[in-house]
C-alpha cells in the first residue's frame, strides 16, 4: 500500500506566498479538522486548497480503500509556477511591470494507523 496519497493542483492563479499561509495551518491536522479550518478562514486561497485536499482524500478512498475519517494531512506545500508578466501604466508615460504569480499546490494524506 502507498505510504502517502497525494493530489496536485497546478497553475493556480494565486501567489505561492498567500497559499503557504493557509497550508501552514492545516499541515499535520486530521482531514476533518483541516476541512473545518478551511471552511471558516476568510482567504481566497482556501478554495483551491480545499479542492486539492478533497481530491487527495478521494484518491485514498478510491485507490487504497482508506477511511476518510482516519486520514491526516501529512504533507502540504505550494511551489511557484510560471509568472505572467504584464505591464501597468506608470508615471511620465512609462510602463511598470506587474508579475502575476501562479502556484502548484500539493497535499498528501496518510492513514492515522500508519502515523502511529
Curated annotation (Swiss-Prot):
NCBIfam families: rplV_bact. The gene is rplV. Gene3D superfamilies: Ribosomal protein L22/L17 (3.90.470.10). It holds the Pfam family Ribosomal_L22. Signal peptide: none annotated. SUPFAM superfamilies: Ribosomal protein L22. One of its GO terms (cellular component) is cytosolic large ribosomal subunit. It comes from Gloeobacter violaceus (strain ATCC 29082 / PCC 7421). One of its GO terms (molecular function) is structural constituent of ribosome. Keywords: Ribonucleoprotein, Ribosomal protein, RNA-binding, rRNA-binding. It comes from the Bacteria. This protein binds specifically to 23S rRNA; its binding is stimulated by other ribosomal proteins, e.g. L4, L17, and L20. It is important during the early stages of 50S assembly. It makes multiple contacts with different domains of the 23S rRNA in the assembled 50S subunit and ribosome. This is Large ribosomal subunit protein uL22. Belongs to the universal ribosomal protein uL22 family. GO terms for biological process: translation. Part of the 50S ribosomal subunit.
Amino acid at each position: 500500500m502507498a505510504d502517502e496519497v497525494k493530489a496536485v493542483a497546478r497553475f493556480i492563479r494565486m501567489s505561492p506566498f498567500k497559499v503557504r499561509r493557509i497550508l501552514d495551518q492545516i499541515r499535520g491536522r486530521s482531514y476533518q479538522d483541516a476541512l473545518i479550518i478551511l471552511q471558516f478562514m476568510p482567504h481566497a486561497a482556501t478554495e483551491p486548497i480545499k479542492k486539492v485536499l478533497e481530491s487527495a482524500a478521494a484518491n485514498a478512498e478510491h485507490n487504497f480503500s482508506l477511511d476518510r475519517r482516519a486520514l491526516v494531512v501529512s504533507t502540504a506545500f505550494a511551489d511557484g509556477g510560471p509568472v505572467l508578466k504584464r505591464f501597468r501604466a506608470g508615471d511620465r508615460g512609462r510602463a511598470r511591470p506587474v508579475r502575476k504569480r501562479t502556484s502548484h499546490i500539493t497535499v498528501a494524506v496518510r492513514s492515522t494507523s500508519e502515523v502511529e
